[in-house]
């Protein structure tokens, strides 16, 4: 079938059937909840969820950041009154994020300030207490940096982009292509160096399309058949397992059970998920190998004796 399509397209005229362009925006990322901070710190620095919780507790006890075990990523509107003090503190520190704090537009109010979204505690943010930055441990500096950047992002404009979708017909077949051009980086300007290999959107952002109009003729440059095999699912890291625990409903087939798990935010709480992973390691059901979690013989044996309704609910 693939060979036939290549031949038919090669010997047929091709025309642009439609061109659709839309301007869009990407809103500022939200400040951190504990689990979101643990996930990002795991991806960026390789920290375990417990490492993050311990270091974050230390920052909290030093009064440099707000309550560390929060499950919320929004801020109360009255907290906006602290923005000047916080941004001024961040701007004078000798830290990678300080230049961005200095250029922040304090007139911007992002979606993060929303009283209706607040739970028992608000998102984790820097406090008005200026940290003794040089005295912080490396982990504390790195975590404070993540939290500071997420806070500073609230005072930068949304990212603006132009997305293009093109449909063309050739040989009785319809083909599509899409791309995205960034018009203004906005808050994403200081997240440019973050490596997110699994971010499909980032790949699309790098693909731009030439100017085309409906009815334009296009030339067939060539075609080839590529054979491939599906990849095995990647193993969990402590960070991705933490995310899966919070979103466990996505792995559950029973719709009623999945709905219940989604409502209660999955397995464990913000404060206990890290300790659950640690407990599994201490009991030798799983082990950390090259930054990935792998089951031990004991863990595999346990799974073999458990009923399917437990393993695959």
Give short role names for the model-derived ranges:
Residues 1-313:
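Core catalytic DNA strand-manipulation module of type IA topoisomerases
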């Amino acid at each position: 079938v693939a060979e036939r399509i290549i031949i038919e397209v090669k010997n047929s005229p091709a025309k642009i059937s439609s061109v659709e362009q839309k301007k869009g925006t990407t809103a500022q990322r939200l400040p951190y909840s504990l689990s979101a901070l643990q996930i990002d710190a795991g991806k960026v620095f390789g920290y375990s969820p417990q490492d993050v919780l311990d270091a974050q507790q230390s920052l909290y006890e030093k009064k440099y950041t707000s309550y560390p075990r929060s499950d919320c990523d929004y801020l109360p509107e009255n907290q906006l009154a602290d923005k000047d003090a916080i941004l001024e503190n961040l701007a004078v520190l000798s830290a990678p994020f300080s230049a961005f704090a200095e250029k922040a537009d304090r007139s911007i109010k992002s979606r993060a300030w929303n009283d209706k979204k607040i739970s028992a505690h608000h998102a984790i943010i820097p406090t008005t207490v200026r940290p003794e930055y040089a005295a912080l441990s490396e982990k504390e500096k790195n975590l404070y940096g993540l939290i500071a950047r997420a806070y500073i992002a609230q005072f930068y404009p949304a990212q603006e982009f132009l997305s293009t979708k093109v449909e063309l017909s050739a040989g009785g077949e319809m083909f599509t292509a899409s791309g995205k051009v960034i018009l203004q980086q906005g808050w994403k300007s200081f997240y440019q160096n973050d490596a997110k290999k699994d971010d499909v959107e980032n790949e699309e952002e790098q693909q731009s399309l030439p100017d085309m109009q409906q009815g334009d003729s296009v030339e067939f440059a060539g075609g080839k058949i590529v054979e491939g095999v599906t990849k095995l699912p990647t193993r969990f890291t402590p960070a991705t397992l933490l995310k899966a625990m919070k979103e466990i409903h996505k792995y559950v087939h029973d719709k009623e059970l999945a709905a219940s798990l989604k409502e209660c935010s999955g397995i464990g709480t913000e404060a206990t998920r890290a300790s659950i992973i640690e407990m599994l390691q201490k009991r030798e059901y799983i082990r950390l190998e090259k930054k990935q979690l792998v089951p031990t013989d004991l863990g595999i044996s346990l799974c073999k004796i458990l009923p399917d309704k437990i393993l695959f609910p």
